[in-house]
Amino acid sequence: MNQMVDMGHAVPAARGLREARAFAPASVANVAVGFDLLGYPLDGVGDTVTVRRIDAPVVRIAAIRGTTVALPLEAERNTAGAALMSLRAALALPFGFELEIDKGIALSSGMGGSAASCVAALVAANALLDTPVSTDQLYQHALDGEAVASGSRHGDNLGPLFLGGLVLCTLERLVPIAVPEAWHSLVVHPEAVLETRRAREALAGDYRLSEFVAQSTNLALVLAGCHAGDADLVRAGLRDVLVEPRRAPLITGFAQAKQAALAHAALGASISGAGPSVFAWFETRAAAAAAAPAVQAAFAGVGLDSQAWVTPINSPAARLLA
């Protein structure tokens, strides 16, 4: 049975423990209104990382499974490896780590695959330390790891994996955002690839002040709506006027998929992370499940197969596995 671990406090390592395994879920980042700031986990899909404490003072990756695409085994070029290198350096550890990564998240899907490997590795490694470090410290090392994948430090895929639920992620702190338990998320991943770096390149160029004002207004409406449990406020604000218009042309079928979600009573819908996955919020699980076939049909209409997940927005964080 999986063992849930409270990520808010350091848990002393079992004496003599040499191996630990952790699971970290996929995640939705940006959430339409919080570019590089907001994110939440997706229960039921994620990456598993096994970490062994070794005598050699190095970090090495022994295996990566679950993907047909070759991922770098060099620790410094892998998000999980780079995060553990950052941890080792900060603590001046006299020992090292060996990792095995089992991928459960499609690459370049907009579902936080690189972040999941990174956080799972840190959670497992933390259990092997004589004196485990705090979540805040782990988060800083995760930022170092995630920078390998995206080219910059941003925590919107990372923070939710440490705290669970909707999280506001600055570079200095993580702030949990209360969301009604009944609210659910639908995520649909079309079988297409959109590299994060390419998606970020689409954001280059000039922006108008009016766009920033509108986006700030939408962010405020969503946060206020979540805090108050007011679906109408969230519905008024859960739309992206800043990033989505620049990335949507890169995602075949996005406009049709978004419209299908909105036609089925979604509070809002937009791009998950860098895409091509699409997310939508609903007031109930039943509503989210009812919308899934329509959103998938929209992608099928442009020749794309897809997978769909319905999960609570308040999904759990990364956890150690027994």
UniProtKB/Swiss-Prot annotation:
Catalyzes the ATP-dependent phosphorylation of L-homoserine to L-homoserine phosphate. One of its GO terms (cellular component) is cytoplasm. Its main location: cytoplasm. GO terms for biological process: threonine biosynthetic process. Keywords: Amino-acid biosynthesis, ATP-binding, Cytoplasm, Kinase, Nucleotide-binding, Threonine biosynthesis, Transferase. ATP binds at residues 106-116. InterPro entries: GHMP_kinase_C_dom (IPR013750), GHMP_kinase_C_sf (IPR036554), GHMP_kinase_N_dom (IPR006204), Homoserine_kinase (IPR000870), Ribosomal_Su5_D2-typ_SF (IPR020568), Ribsml_uS5_D2-typ_fold_subgr (IPR014721). The keyword Transferase applies. It is found in: Cytoplasm. The lineage of its organism: Bacteria, Pseudomonadati, Pseudomonadota, Gammaproteobacteria, Lysobacterales. One of its GO terms (molecular function) is ATP binding. SUPFAM superfamilies: GHMP Kinase, C-terminal domain (SSF55060), Ribosomal protein S5 domain 2-like (SSF54211). It is an enzyme of class 2 (transferase). This is Homoserine kinase. The keyword ATP-binding applies. Its EC number is 2.7.1.39. Pathway: Amino-acid biosynthesis; L-threonine biosynthesis; L-threonine from L-aspartate: step 4/5. It catalyses: L-homoserine + ATP = O-phospho-L-homoserine + ADP + H(+). PANTHER family: HOMOSERINE KINASE, HOMOSERINE/4-DIPHOSPHOCYTIDYL-2-C-METHYL-D-ERYTHRITOL KINASE. Belongs to the GHMP kinase family. Homoserine kinase subfamily.
